[in-house]
């Protein structure tokens, strides 16, 4: 059952949909994985990971956007990607993560490109950023592959030091 009014976005191999209760355990498992969740700045205990999932549901209701669940066309939950802009964020961010076993298949790239197109075409954003923890080389490479360029570093009150990458305007992504 959908927990938000998120649209259903399709790409060549993926379905991006709003969060559902069945997504909670895979998201919590990701957030608590000491290796995989470094890009989120810290490893939360289970209760805080549960609250992050609930926060994303609320984020959709407050802003009309948030993280989509990335689902393969065969029904596997592969990760999350979306637009994130909670209190204290410098501006709307395009974010992505893929879960264990889904790396190296272009899933994050395909999902993030589809979300960015939706944000530009349907939400009217002129630009987006991606905030990346230093040392997250895979996310840096993905941001650069999408045409984003490093703009500055800043201290994110939730995640510590972040590198802000600026995505090109819609016209440059066509």
Report each predicted region and the residues it spans.
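Acyl-donor (CoA/ACP) binding surface of acyl/acetyltransferases
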Residues: 1-39, 54, 67-174
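Active-site rim helix/loop that mediates acceptor-substrate recognition in acyltransferases
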Residues: 45-64
